[in-house]
Each structure stands twice: as C-alpha cells, then as structure tokens.
Amino acid sequence: DPEKFATMVVKQSGSGAGGDLEPTFIECRAEGLRVYEGAKVSFELKTSQISKDAKFQNLIKKVAREAPYRTWVSSQGTPMDARYVKRDGLFITLKDKNGKEIKVQTTQLSRASQQIARKYEDARKAKRPDPSARYVIFLIRGKGTSAWSQASRVCAQQGCKYGQLPLDGEGEIDLSLFSGS
C-alpha cells in the first residue's frame, strides 16, 4: 500500500551548484516514466513507448536546446530567460532567446544571479565549460532501471545533459525544495 511509504524529499546537495539549478525531473518506475513540471506530474509514459513518444522526444530536445539558458532575476525580482555572454567591467551581457543582447549592471541583478554570473566567470578563467542550469535528473526507483536505460539513451541521442538519483523505496516524491530555484 503506497500510502504507508514515507515521502521522499529530493533536495540539492552540497555539490556547489547552489540554487541555480532548473532541472526537469523524470521518475523511472517499473511501469515507465513519470515526467514532472515543477513539483507536479506533467505526464506519464509506458516503458515500451519511451523511444517513440513525440511529447517525450520534444521535451528532451527542448531541455537540450535550452541548456545554455537560465532564469536571471533582477534586484527588483523580475525574471528574465537568457544566456550569459560576457562581463565587461560592471556590466554583464546576456542574450535572450530571440537573440537580443541585454547589458545590465551587476548591481541590477539579485544576489543569487550575481553569484551565478561569478560561476560563469570562474569557469571561463579556468577554461572549463559554462555551467548548465537546465538538464534532466532521473529519479530511479528500484524496478525502474529499464525505463531509465531507454530514457537516458534518448537524452544521449539528443545531446541533453542528465544525471540520476537512485530512490530507496516507493514513497511519494516531494520536489518542493526545487520550486523557484
């Protein structure tokens, strides 16, 4: 009886990623996949349909395409979807999805967005790849390895970054700690 299982709270680790993650969670179960949008279930998919399902394929393509983008927040709390281009003195250049370049003073960004900009600068100074905010995190149930294997193959084929987290048990999943991250 699933109601008797404890709720599993998924939280960010101390990996240094901080609150700048914008993951797409996909639960891998014996029956197939359960795809989350935010903290809520968006759709479910049987294992046999994973490699053929257009909705799933399009989701993975979208996550791969948007990997360089993230939600930047102004000091007034206004969100903006853009990718980091460069820093020039006190100004940061961002580019939105329409290709428009936006120059903002670092002081016009929230502290969290300023910290994210520093991560880009540090990565570039060290000649490492830019940090990605958008990727898939597979939440793998004990009997969900077949679904995970097929879904991760789709990610690899589409060039979508992904990670995995094994789940110990069958309880409900709580993703609320990622809301608004």
Predicted segments, located by residue:
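Extracytoplasmic juxtamembrane/flexible linker immediately downstream
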Residues: 1-44
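Extracytoplasmic
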Residues: 19-23, 30, 67, 77-79, ...
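Soluble periplasmic/extracytoplasmic beta-strand elements of cell-envelope proteins
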Residues: 23-29, 34-37, 83, 93-95, ...
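Short acidic, S/G/P-rich loop/turn micro-motifs used as interaction or catalytic elements
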Residues: 32-35, 142-147, 170
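Periplasmic peptidoglycan-binding/anchoring modules of Gram-negative envelope and division proteins
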Residues: 43-66, 81, 115, 122-134
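Extracytoplasmic/secreted envelope proteins and their assembly/folding machinery
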Residues: 53, 57-61, 110, 114-117, ...
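Compositionally biased alpha-helical segments
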Residues: 61-124
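A non-catalytic structural micro-motif
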Residues: 139, 156-172
